[in-house]
């Protein structure tokens, strides 16, 4: 997803 470090788990 988008947001970077906040949602990197959703690559």
Swiss-Prot record:
Alphabetically ordered keywords of this record: Amidation, Neuropeptide, Secreted
GO annotation, biological process: neuropeptide signaling pathway
Keyword Secreted: yes
A cellular component term, taken from the record's GO annotations: extracellular region
Superkingdom of the source species: Eukaryota
Organism phylogeny: Eukaryota, Metazoa, Ecdysozoa, Arthropoda, Hexapoda
Name of the protein this chain belongs to: Extended FMRFamide-9
Species this chain originates from: Lobatophasma redelinghuysense (Gladiator)
UniProt similarity note: Belongs to the FARP (FMRF amide related peptide) family.
Role according to the record: FMRFamides and FMRFamide-like peptides are neuropeptides.
Predominant cellular place of this UniProt entry's protein: secreted
Location within or outside the cell: Secreted
Annotated positions of the Leucine amide modification: 11
